[in-house]
UniProtKB/Swiss-Prot annotation:
The modification Phosphoserine is found at S197, S255, S258, S276, S291, S332. The lineage of its organism: Eukaryota, Metazoa, Chordata, Craniata, Vertebrata. Residues 392-414 have a biased composition (Acidic residues). GO terms for cellular component: chromosome, telomeric region; nuclear origin of replication recognition complex; nucleoplasm; nucleus. Residues 418-439 have a biased composition (Polar residues). SUPFAM superfamilies: P-loop containing nucleoside triphosphate hydrolases. GO terms for biological process: DNA replication; DNA replication initiation. The BAH domain mediates binding to dimethylated histone H4 'Lys-20' (H4K20me2), which is enriched at replication origins. ATP binds at V479, G513, V514, P515, G516, T517, G518, K519, T520, A521, E600, N633, R699. It comes from Mus musculus. This is Origin recognition complex subunit 1. GO terms for molecular function: ATP binding; ATP hydrolysis activity; chromatin binding; DNA binding; metal ion binding.
Length: 840
């Protein structure tokens, strides 16, 4: 897309054109035209009915609208110049969740007629950037992609916040009638022409002059020190219009080898045309070819010149006449920015090549070219492949072109390092040209691979028993039909978000509660119900964005996640914060309300607390249309860790989720296991009371029940009869869930290992320290074994026991190279060790 006038940072002044049309009822003066003056002296006249660009949040993508009215509001002091417009929307302005409804990827020039009346169509005239051309197309017409249409916008469909639809017939007819009218097109072009900078016009004229004096292939081969915009990449060869320069020598024999499919007469005619010098302006100190040379060129003769007496003519301007044929570039020196015209060229035919040519003509052998001629043939093949690539548009030809480029560069390096003529004549070898073209191996990794989830080969197996069905229903990721025991909290959150959506304002709500009390699940259910209401037009449409502090590597990355989910853009944290601040703090009228859910808010705490401050400050701005729902585990988090300026912006709308009671946990389990007989009633009552007394965490209750079903299945495999989950199964599961893994490991350890742990505690109590050497612990271990009548192990066996307990992280030990003096510590508390070692 072109860069609009907003990027030039010019100052604009607006003035009315013509007499006003008074409107006494509304205290307004209507106008038909307005003049926009720029500080460089140019003027742009804009009339009612034209399409204009309006300043927006993104200077690169301004808003597009059609002027309906131009008026001056006399009720305000001072009077303001205003306009009433019909909005268009770009594809990037449509919510990300609705873009898939288009079914295709639109070009950047396509806009959509906004067919809704909820946006404010009254704007300030000073926000107008300038006129723009908009072309209306039928839905079946194709948008052109040529260079002339880059500054033109096209409209084919309309957008009504729900779906894309073709333009109404009356709208399409009016737009096309306006497009065909010369009143809107010619003045527009004339005015915009004055706005363009003279430097750009001069550059365009120079480019046109260059293109007229040179062929397209020469223009493409311009050196890198001259940058010309809009350079064409077309390449034609010989009869197609390719011209060569007089300083480039091409062997007629190499042309025969590379283009043997053409006729001899056509080849001679093409060669005579290519050797003719192009038209160039007269320059001082320019060397002109002799008449003998001109006669030879006209007759189509390509006799070799003598290296000592002949001089290759070169142009004075290397920027416009030098090609990429690397012989002259590598062998001719450069003095004071100009190539020397008296240095022999690398393209001169050596003596041994002429002798070889005479011998081949005598014996009528096939013509063999040297390395320089092979390079010429390679370059000729390269141009042929480029021409075929432009004509056919085949991607494989482009890959072959790259291989030829690399091969020609290797040839350039080889030629630049060639020895002198005498040494070259001595080391000359016969080389057989390769007949099969070189093929590039295809990369193993595809360039345009689309990541996707692997397809399932087999269907999902149905649960084979009631216990498997119960495990599926009791999983924390299973979505229930309803959320029991949270009806009041659901209604409060729903009413808060619904009121903000209907009023078009923003706000914050802080939700707190211990883990597993249904905070996130309740908010998800509220959003799901609101989205269903938005589809039936009960509430205005909105965008839903969710971020979780646990999934962020750094608190400032929350800006990146929000921007990516809102617009699909990727940016750094600082840039994303600026874009979001511009979006939520701007005065745009065509914004859709955004509902932002921030889970694990306490993990977004920073030293300056700027992340929390911005999240709570954005909804307070007028026109932000942002609703923030924050979730944390601490009830008094705002008072404990937040500054006053942060907690005051959070507001007083807070909600606390209390832990579940045993009756509520029982109701949750019964609702999940509805119409399924897998648990005894006493077992459900037991687990509900146990969990309610400890934490009230519903997730922990579901996990205990799932583990109990697994224990029940294992007992059936050992020979017991398959029955319902009993109290014994649940007690075993509760012991596993609430007991420490260290205690379980100590209980399942061997007798020698348990005796070694008792020796460690005995030594700690004797010395009064929580650290001892292996020698001290070993003496205590031997004494305990004698008291209990057990055979005490040797020093090596005790060292192996110590190492094994250290590998289990029950002990913290030094490396074994310290031997008897290595220090040992407990990695668990002494009370836990004594609790695990007590006899039941």
């Amino acid at each position: 897309m072109p860069s609009y006038l907003t990027r030039q940072k010019t100052r604009q002044t607006f003035s009315w054109v013509g007499r006003p049309l008074p409107n006494r009822k509304q205290f307004q003066q209507m106008y038909r035209e307005i003049c926009m003056k720029i500080n460089d002296g140019s003027e742009i006249h804009i009339k009612v009915g034209q399409f204009v660009l309006i300043q927006g949040e993104d200077n690169k993508k301004p808003y597009v609208a059609k002027l309906i009215e131009l008026f001056q509001n006399g009720a305000e002091v001072p009077p303001k110049k205003c306009a009433r417009v019909q909005w268009f929307v770009r594809f990037l302005e449509i919510p990300v969740s609705k873009r898939h409804l288009l079914g295709r990827s639109p070009p950047a020039q396509e806009i959509f007629w906004y067919d809704c009346s909820d946006w404010d169509n009254k704007i300030n005239v000073e926000t107008i950037i300038g006129p723009v051309q908009v072309v209306a197309l039928a839905p079946e017409e194709v948008i052109p992609v040529d260079q002339k249409s880059e500054e033109t916008l096209f409209v084919k469909l309309s957008w009504n916040k729900k779906d894309f639809a073709p333009l109404p017939p009356e709208v399409l007819a009016a737009l096309r009638e306006q497009e065909d009218s010369p009143e809107w097109q010619k003045p527009l072009k004339a005015k915009i022409k004055n706005v363009k900078s003279p430097a750009r016009n001069t550059t365009e004229q120079e480019v046109k002059g260059i293109k007229s004096n040179h062929s397209t292939s020469k223009f493409h081969q311009t050196p890198a020190n001259i940058v010309i915009p809009n350079a064409k990449k077309s390449l034609e060869l010989d009869g197609l219009g390719f011209t060569r320069k007089p300083n480039t020598r091409w062997s007629k024999k190499s042309s025969c080898d590379s283009l043997d499919y053409q006729k001899t007469s056509k080849r001679r005619a093409a060669f005579s045309e290519t050797t003719s010098p192009p038209k160039k302006p007269n320059k001082p100190r320019e060397i002109k070819p002799s008449s003998a040379l001109e006669t030879r060129v006209k007759n189509g003769q390509t006799q070799p010149f003598c290296a000592k007496s002949s001089v290759v003519l070169r142009a004075r301007n290397p920027a416009m006449t030098t090609t990429k044929l690397g012989v002259d570039n590598t062998l001719s020196p450069i003095r004071n920015g100009l190539r020397s015209s008296v240095v022999p060229s690398g393209g001169l035919t050596p003596v041994y090549i002429r002798r070889k040519a005479k011998e081949q003509e005598t014996h009528k052998e096939p013509i063999r070219t040297s390395r320089v001629h092979r390079k010429s043939s390679l370059l000729t093949l390269k141009r042929i492949r480029q021409q075929l690539c432009l004509l056919d548009g085949d991607d494989r030809d482009q890959e072959e072109e790259e291989s030829v480029d690399s091969e020609s560069e290797e040839e350039d390096e080889f030629i630049s390092s060639l020895p002198t003529r005498n040494s070259l004549g001595q080391s000359r070898t016969r080389q057989t040209p390769s007949k099969s073209p070189q093929k590039n191996p295809k990369p193993r990794t595809p360039h345009r691979a689309t990541p996707q989830i692997r397809d399932r080969n087999l269907a999902v197996q149905e649960p084979a028993s009631a216990l498997e069905e119960a495990r599926l229903r009791l999983h924390v990721s299973a979505v229930p039909d309803s959320l029991p025991c949270r009806e009041q909290e659901f209604q409060d959150i729903y009413s808060f978000v619904e009121s903000k959506l209907l009023d078009g304002t923003g706000g914050c709500m802080y939700i707190s509660g211990v883990p597993g009390t249904g905070k996130t699940a309740t908010v998800h259910e509220v959003i799901r119900c609101l989205q269903q209401a938005a589809e039936t037009d009960d509430v205005p449409p909105f965008q839903y964005v969710e971020v979780n502090g646990m999934k962020l590597t750094e608190p400032h990355q929350v800006y990146v996640q929000i921007l990516k989910k809102l617009t699909g853009q990727k940016a750094t944290a600082n840039h994303a914060a600026e874009l979001l601040a511009k979006q939520f703090c701007g005065q745009g009228s065509q914004k859709e309300t955004t509902v932002l859910l921030v889970d694990e808010l306490d993990l977004l705490w920073t030293h300056k607390q700027d992340v929390m401050y911005n999240l709570f400050d954005w909804p307070t701005h007028k026109g932000a249309h942002l609703i923030v729902l924050t979730i944390a585990n601490t009830m008094d988090l705002p008072e404990r860790i937040m500054m006053n300026r942060v907690s005051s912006r959070l507001g007083l709308t807070r909600m606390s989720f209390q832990p579940y009671s045993h009756s509520q946990l029982k109701q949750i389990l019964v609702s999940r296991l509805r119409n399924l007989r897998a648990f005894e009633d006493d077992a459900i009552q037991l687990v509900a009371r146990k969990v309610a007394a400890l934490s009230g965490d519903a997730r922990r209750c579901l996990d205990i029940c799932r583990r109990a079903t697994e224990i029940c299945e294992l007992s059936h495999l050992r020979g017991d009869s398959l029955s319902l989950v009993t109290v014994a199964h649940l007690m075993e599961a509760i012991d596993e869930m609430f007991s420490s893994s260290y205690i379980t490991a100590i209980k399942n350890s061997s007798v020698v290992e348990q005796s070694f742990l008792r020796a460690i505690i005995a030594e700690f109590r004797r010395s009064g320290l929580e650290e001892a050497t292996f020698q001290q612990i070993y003496s205590q271990h031997v004494a305990l074994c004698r008291m209990e009548g057990l055979p005490y192990p040797t020093m090596s066996e005790t060292m192996a026991v110590c190492s094994r307990l250290g590998s289990c992280r029950l002990l913290l030990v030094e490396p074994s190279r310290n031997d008897l003096l290595l220090r040992v510590r407990l990695n668990v508390s002494q009370n836990d060790v004594l609790f695990a070692l007590k006899e039941e």
